Amino acid sequence: MSYSDVSPAEVKQRLRQEALSRRADLSHVFRIEASLSLADHVDQLRLADGCIVAGFWPIRDEIDPRPLLDALRKKGHRLCLPVVAEPHLIFRELTRETEFVSAGFGTQAPSPDAAELRPDVLLMPLAAFDCSGNRIGYGKGHYDMAISALEQSGPLDCVGLAYCVQEMSDVPAEPHDKPMDGILTEMGFRRF
């Protein structure tokens, strides 16, 4: 069966499963080394001085952005993490003093006491991506809705974080899908 015989949602689900399977097959040691290497590429991001960067708390076998976030903090950027809220994600400040609460899915989020921030740069987890900047998330639409809301109040740089093995030759884009501005993998940063 060709992809032209199925809906974009079905294609995305197949690609999501394939990419997540590839990611799950990576060794534990490789995942650690790849996550650490993100910080080695921090200067390739070329972020404006003092911008606010939203990261994420990794779940399952996602690439771990915490070494990168620490490198960004050392460069003077304010950090925040997403919190699932209605009608879309909000972002709370992340500092060394931040208290965390369980946020479901095995992840942590800053407590409600943390200041809510509007990020300039959104570092996003993903299941799969292609060379045009299209991404497949986990199917809940949290980031799509957050991006749409954040773009109402100004520019937003959307950067995916992933392992190279999550790249696919072609990811279908639907009208609600916003392409990423760049991708950072263990091999470095690519701007789309």
Give short role names for the model-derived ranges.
Residues 1-10, 14, 21-24, 113, ...:
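Surface-exposed, charge/polar-rich loops and edge strands
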